[in-house]
Amino acid sequence: MKFTLVATVLLTFSLSAFAVEYPVLTTASPDQVGFDSQKLHRLDGWIQNQIDAGYPSINLLVIKDNHIVLQKAWGYAKKYDGSTLLAHPIRATTNTMYDLASNTKMYATNFALQKLVYEGKIDVNDLVSKYIPGFKDMPGDKIKGKDKLRIIDILHHVAGFPADPQYPNKNVAGKLFSQSKSTTLEMIKKTPLEYQPGSKHIYSDVDYMILGFIVESITAMPLDRYVETTIYKPLGLKHTVFNPLMKGFTPPQIAATELHGNTRDGVIHFPNIRTNTLWGQVHDEKAWYSMGGVSGHAGLFSDTHDMAVLMQVMLNGGGYGNVKLFDDKTVAQFTRRSPEDATFGLGWRVNGNASMTPTFGVLASPQTYGHTGWTGTLTSIDPVNHMAIVILGNRPHSPVANPKVNPNVFVSGLLPAATYGWIVDRIYGSLK
């Protein structure tokens, strides 16, 4: 009996000795972690000036040395109903959820892939066709090579796919038109390559739609269920979901986006296009119409606190508290610069040269990585300075500047706040 008790104690001690406990976020004053509070406070007035000039809202959170040192919201989660300015607009709060747009690629699809790679369930050198049957060149394709494409080619955005085939818009997509998920996968298989794989980097939504299907193939689960149950729930995240209106959230909890659906103030039309102000539904057309709101490239909603936890996972080398998703080797593998273009990792955008200044500013370390989202979102993770910044915004919640000239430029997009590096540099410039 005594031997059994001793053995049990030793085993318990042995297991606890090898248990990994990762840092968790706490709050601290800016001065405690090396900021000049007075300089950082000047950011408040500058952002408010942008709100006064017409930028809808900005939610900002800054992490330094495992501490949240700044978390604040400016502006309005909803200020328009169609073209009408609301008499009583809804203010943004630090709990407001935002459409992450292409940050979905990192914090849903990449997190899932990093977890699966760490668990040995997938190798980035695997062929795409291993997980998507029928993924091959089509008769008549002018550029060949689909059947030789690897997951790493998709992650590096060198696979040959066009940036945006606009599957839900029949006027543009033609024979590739799709407004259902099952049809969309078949249309992706039929999408012709635009350039010889490996010859250049072209950032493509199609790449991440493919990766989302691969995650579903490996896990035998819808992408949203997989990430929500195996990543977000263990981390204690409460506001990070796809299709929030179907999962218990209400519009007032979420920042609104485009004023007239996806019509760009009435100049774009296709079957089933939304025309009402978008509020709680993903803005991205392919994600909404072609994928039912859940796609590897867009569709995720979150708030700044949940995003802070996800960024801290990366800074920690793969875990948070007693939750381990992957390891530091996996983080290094996915954030390593591509040999052909120093601004691309495996999915992650890297601060590899001056072309990334509008994103990461001029003061972040060259090892900084992160991503942006079309709706006005940025994540910036700097392992050298042990610092991370998340900016969430609803930039399309303003009129289109000149619909007939360029329907994708919103009035708010012409303001300095639309260039994330302006905000990022003001934060770094506040370090002592």
Curated annotation (Swiss-Prot):
A Gene Ontology term for the protein's cellular component: plasma membrane
Gene Ontology molecular function terms on file: serine-type D-Ala-D-Ala carboxypeptidase activity
Membrane topology, as annotated: Single-pass membrane protein
A Pfam family hit: Beta-lactamase
Record EC number: 3.4.16.4
UniProt keyword Oxidoreductase present: no
UniProt key word tRNA-binding: no
Chain segments annotated as transmembrane: 7-25
Reaction it catalyzes: Preferential cleavage: (Ac)2-L-Lys-D-Ala-|-D-Ala. Also transpeptidation of peptidyl-alanyl moieties that are N-acyl substituents of D-alanine
GO BP annotation list: proteolysis
Keywords: Carboxypeptidase, Cell inner membrane, Cell membrane, Hydrolase, Membrane, Protease, Transmembrane, Transmembrane helix
Localization annotation: Cell inner membrane
Protein family: Belongs to the peptidase S12 family. YfeW subfamily.
PANTHER family in UniProt: BETA-LACTAMASE-RELATED (PTHR43283), BETA-LACTAMASE-RELATED DOMAIN-CONTAINING PROTEIN (PTHR43283:SF11)
Name of the molecule in the record: Putative D-alanyl-D-alanine carboxypeptidase
Source organism: Salmonella schwarzengrund (strain CVM19633)
The organism's taxonomic lineage, starting at the top: Bacteria, Pseudomonadati, Pseudomonadota, Gammaproteobacteria, Enterobacterales
